Regions:
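Surface-exposed helix-capping loop/turn segments at secondary-structure junctions
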Residues: 149-160, 182-183, 205-211
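GST-like domain detector, emphasizing the conserved glutathione-binding G-site
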Residues: 1-157, 161, 227-228
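Charge-dense, low-complexity polyampholytic segments
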Residues: 126-130, 186, 220
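GST superfamily/GST-like fold recognition
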Residues: 159-182, 186, 190-196
Length: 231
């Protein structure tokens, strides 16, 4: 049997996954070429995925010369470490996503990890009803308020440059209209600065090329509800 070739970068991903989209946006921002490998999540998972992430059996997984790196935020951090900027190259893509200052970097990691709650609580909105949904709504609004406050009046979470926290949060934006509908709230009202930030980010090439329209996300949620037998 011929030996399997594992050279360069391969991203094991699923088209609508916001966690995989974090990796796609980061790769685009840094101008790093890679191969995309679409994975099946609702059916039988590929042997490659199971071998690459035997613990969680989830995407995204980044294969670098055949060696797997799992979990989206760990992948983002890895890309910064493995593909450091070249001082001799002047390019907007020749950049670090994380701040070089240790404290600023720690804060960025905190807020990026905290943003996972948007997806977690949003999922509870469309899965649950009644009091449980109301609780998820209240918690999600609190998370959005915290993110809005952390952003403040800055253009991006790191200041003037699109960076680590922006990459972590922006893939959740196409999911927000569905969350608004199930939770009966408005992001524009609850977190106006965050809503304005989302509109600014939408025009970035890396973001526009990685995310899907909210309508496609809503169709996917509807499909998931049918798959799990949720009325």
């Amino acid at each position: 049997m011929a030996e399997e070739k594992n050279e360069g970068l391969v991203l094991l991903d699923f088209w609508v996954s916001p966690f995989g989209q974090r990796c796609r946006i980061a790769l685009a921002e840094k101008g790093i070429p890679y191969e995309y490998s679409e994975q099946e999540l609702l059916g039988a998972k590929s042997d490659l995925l199971l071998r690459s992430n035997p613990v969680h059996k989830k995407i995204p997984v980044l294969l670098h010369d055949g060696r797997p790196v799992s979990e989206s935020l760990i992948i983002l951090n890895y890309l910064d470490e493995a593909f450091r900027p070249d001082p001799a190259v002047s390019s907007s893509r020749n950049k670090l996503l994380l701040p070089s200052d240790p404290y600023a970097g720690a804060q960025a990691r905190f807020w990026a990890a905290y943003s996972d709650k948007v997806y977690e609580l949003g999922t509870r909105l469309w899965k649950l009803k009644g009091e449980a949904r109301a609780q998820a709504r209240a918690e999600l609004l609190q998370v959005l308020t915290h993110l809005d406050g952390q952003l403040g009046d800055r253009e991006f979470f790191g200041g003037e440059e699109f960076g680590f926290v922006d990459v972590a949060i922006v893939p959740f934006v196409p999911w927000l209209p569905s969350y608004e509908r199930y939770g009966e709230f408005s992001v524009d009202e609850a977190a106006p600065r965050l809503a304005a930030w989302a509109r600014r980010c939408a025009g970035r090439e890396s973001v526009a090329g990685s995310l899907h329209p909210p309508e496609k996300v809503d169709e996917f949620i509807t499909m998931l509800k049918k798959h799990y037998g949720i009325e």
